[in-house]
Amino acid sequence: MTLFLTSSPSGCPFEPGPDIPVLDTRNHFVANLRAVWPDHAVLGLAIAADPYAYEQNDEMCRVFAQSFANAHLPLTALIPCDARNAEEIGSLLPQSGFVMLCGGHVPTQNHFFAQLGLPGLFHNYHGIVLGVSAGSMNAAHIVYAAPEEPGEAADPHYSRWLNGLGLTETRILPHYQFIRDHVLDGQKVEDIALADSKKRHFLALPDGSYILCADGSEALYGKGWYFADGMMEEINEDEDVLPLR
């Protein structure tokens, strides 16, 4: 498979934007998608973060189907995978040339992915996978589920490390340019991340940066920060490409 791990494919989701999101052309994102896209329209499957947010999942598919059409990345349809059709995942996934791992609450999505049996199902998948925010986080073998909802940072029972899909060993923290100075439960998000990096390392990405995984190699496109051992370092600049493995 070809795996794109994005913070967001269409700019910062927390800032005002057009009704139909425009796919980000920074760091060759759209160009790299087009380079691997088949020369015909493919079925798209958007695997939800919240399996019961039916209206939200339908609307997300509607707007992103148009986004991909506007970027000349043709889909026959973009259908949501949530609680309504979860039992069909075994047949839906092999039919889909494109899979979107949607954004949302990381632990909620992680639980849904496990219910679907996705880690095993992806072993034989050879299409294009696009992770978006939480979806990119849950693609990792061991996920860094950074606290994001009020109460999570202060909860000693909140699990910050989860078993993910195993599509990559790279853990990401998305929307970093937006969240780094936020305060959660009295702690700055950046300070929470630095403390957590003493246990396991991860990459913080701003919107517009992404990791491309293909043919056994991975590369960071755009700016990123490496967190490890309680420290962080900016390791790449916009429009630069850094091989990771």
Predicted features and spans:
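Catalytic-core regions built around general acid/base machinery
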Residues: 92-95, 115-127
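C-terminal and late-domain segments of enzyme folds
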Residues: 1-38, 48, 54-58, 145, ...
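Glycine/threonine-rich flexible loop motifs
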Residues: 106-115, 182
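Structural motif
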Residues: 4-5, 98-102, 130-131, 171-173
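Catalytic nucleophile loop
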Residues: 101-102, 124-142
